[in-house]
Amino acid sequence: MLGVVDIGLGNNQSIYKFLRKIRHDYTVVATPDHLADIQKLIFPGVGTFKEAATRLQSTGLLGGIQKYIENDGSYLGICLGMQLMARLGYEVSLSEGFGIFDAEVVRMMPDQGLALPHIGWNSVQHDGSGMFSKIAINEDFYFVHSYFMRLDSPHIHFNSSYGGNFTAYVRSGNAHGVQFHPEKSQKAGQQFLKNFLEC
């Protein structure tokens, strides 16, 4: 069964709409008990790292999802759901994430006087393999964010650029994270989500 994390933040309705469109069954995950029969887990999100971490901690999902990923569960974190895979986040104030990556989520500081939040279409410097199978190398994806995961590790990752490079995709085992919104990225995003559901 596919689970979609819902802690009352973000854009879950667009994910639900996509899953209904392709007739893929899913269940809402709001407590650790809901993780019991989950084979794949999507964590969409728009919001602050601090608020999400607080809600996850209060529901017990912070530890529950961390354990799910550490046990090689198939996970896709979208935007905030990716950022929470880091060890620490500095949005609003210092908070702990799942700690899947020894990384920090920090505010972007784009060159050339570019505005924040970063909103719009940018290409991802991927190699066409794995989760990016059947997606053109120069394809654009849709981003909305002011923070990014600062990653200094050997884990698989691809960058995008907005006045400087930032991490757009990261992977550790069966856990994947994307800073962009595949559910809002038209055909390329739909293919990305299908690749995750079929992998």
Name every feature range the model reports, one short phrase each.
Residues 2-23, 182-185:
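N-terminal beta1-alpha1 ligand-phosphate binding loop
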Residues 9, 45-47:
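Short glycine-/small-residue-rich Rossmann-like dinucleotide-binding loops
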Residues 26-37:
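Short acidic low-complexity segments
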Residues 40:
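Short, Asp-centered acidic motifs that coordinate Mg2+ and/or phosphate
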Residues 148-199:
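C-terminal and late-domain segments of enzyme folds
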